[in-house]
């Protein structure tokens, strides 16, 4: 380690501290302090101020209601969509539905196999008799 790095850091930090000390922040004032004294307002100015405040309040509430309605519309469209399921039961049901909807197309090309309740057991009994 050289002495150049700590000395440059020290010089930089002293410069920052000097600049920070010379800066002064302005005090924040609330919006109520900037308003003139309500007793000093004329009746016409008071009505105009009240009308402006009511208009701003109504506009803000209208925007909030519109946003809520948009969110509800997005939420209802999501619930209306069909959820996909990849479990064995769901896949089996989908395949059964596909076969039942296809109707005669699959049945006309279907070659029956010799499986069922009589396929294995009856032959053994018939052979023994």
Curated annotation (Swiss-Prot):
Disulfides per UniProt: 85-90
Main location per the UniProt record: secreted
Signal sequence interval, chain numbering: 1-25
Protein family per UniProt: Belongs to the calcitonin family.
Modified residue annotations for Phenylalanine amide: 120
Protein name according to UniProt: Calcitonin gene-related peptide 2
Annotated source species: Equus caballus (Horse)
Known function: CALCB/CGRP2 is a peptide hormone that induces vasodilation mediated by the CALCRL-RAMP1 receptor complex. Dilates a variety of vessels including the coronary, cerebral and systemic vasculature. Its abundance in the CNS also points toward a neurotransmitter or neuromodulator role.
Protein localization: Secreted
Keywords: Amidation, Cleavage on pair of basic residues, Disulfide bond, Hormone, Secreted, Signal
GO cellular component, one term: extracellular space
